[in-house]
C-alpha cells in the first residue's frame, strides 16, 4: 500500500493527515500504532483521515485515531488542521467547511489570517451523555484518584473530559493523576483529563492528559471543556484565553444551550509518502 500524507500540528499537538478520498488507504490498529511511533514511524499524537461525506449536507467526513490505534469522536486541534489540509490539497475552496464526525457535525471557518474558528457544538453536561457515572448532574463532583480526593467538572465536547482546578499547572501531578483519571471506573469510555489554573476570569493555563495519547502540547477539545466547566462553575467569563504548553487558543461560550467556539492556528509542517 502506497499513499501520500501531510504532517501538521495545532500548537504542538501533532497529526498525520491522510486524504482517503483520492487514495485507497486502510489503517489497521496495528499500522496506526507503528506509524505513530516517534522512533521508528512518522510520529504523531493523532491520525486524521479525510473521507467523502457520509451526509449530503456536509462537505467531508472527519475521522480521528489516537496513537494507540483507538478511534475517537473529537479532536479540536485536529479540526483546525483538517480545514487547512482540505484547502491546501485542493479538495475544497470554501472558507466555511461542514464536516461530520463519529458523534455529530462541525463547522470549520478559515479566517483571513490563516487561523481557524471551529464551532465545537453545545457542551453536554448530562452524565449519561458524557458518559460519566453519577446519580445526577452537578457542577462539581467529588472523585477519588489513588490517594487523592479531587473536585472535578465533567463535560462532553463530542468526547469526554474531566476538569480539575489546580493552584499551579507547573506543579500539578499530571503524570500520576492523568492516567488514573483517564481509566477511572466512572468513565466507561475512558476520559481526557484536564488540569486548569485560573489566572483571571478571562485567562486560564491548562495541561491535558489525553486518553490514548498521554499528555500533549495542546488539546483543543480539552481547552473547550475546561472553559465550559469554568464558566458553569462561575469562575470564568464568556471570552477566555487558554494557555497550553504549545501556545494559546481563544474560546468563546455564552453559556448552557449555546454552541462553543474555538479559534487558533493550524500549521503545515511537511508532506511525505509511505509504502507499507
Curated annotation (Swiss-Prot):
Top EC class, one word = isomerase
Residues of the active site are 75 (proton donor), 219 (proton acceptor)
- Keyword match Calcium: no
**Gene Ontology biological-process annotations:** lysine biosynthetic process via diaminopimelate
Q: Where does substrate bind?
A: 13, 46, 66, 76-77, 159, 192, 210-211, 220-221
Output the Gene3D superfamilies linked to this UniProt entry: Diaminopimelate Epimerase, Chain A, domain 1
What GO annotations for molecular function exist for this entry? diaminopimelate epimerase activity
Q: Where is this site: Important for dimerization?
A: 270
Where is it localised?
Cytoplasm
EC number(s) reported in the record? 5.1.1.7
Reaction catalysed by this chain? (2S,6S)-2,6-diaminopimelate = meso-2,6-diaminopimelate
UniProt keywords, alphabetically:
Amino-acid biosynthesis, Cytoplasm, Isomerase, Lysine biosynthesis
| Site residues by UniProt (Could be important to modulate the pK values of the two catalytic cysteine residues) | 161, 210
Biological pathway: Amino-acid biosynthesis; L-lysine biosynthesis via DAP pathway; DL-2,6-diaminopimelate from LL-2,6-diaminopimelate: step 1/1
Q: Name one GO cellular component term.
A: cytosol
Record-stated family: Belongs to the diaminopimelate epimerase family.
- Function in brief: Catalyzes the stereoinversion of LL-2,6-diaminopimelate (L,L-DAP) to meso-diaminopimelate (meso-DAP), a precursor of L-lysine and an essential component of the bacterial peptidoglycan.
Provide the assembly information: Homodimer.
The molecule here is called: Diaminopimelate epimerase
Question: What gene, per UniProt, encodes this protein?
Answer: dapF
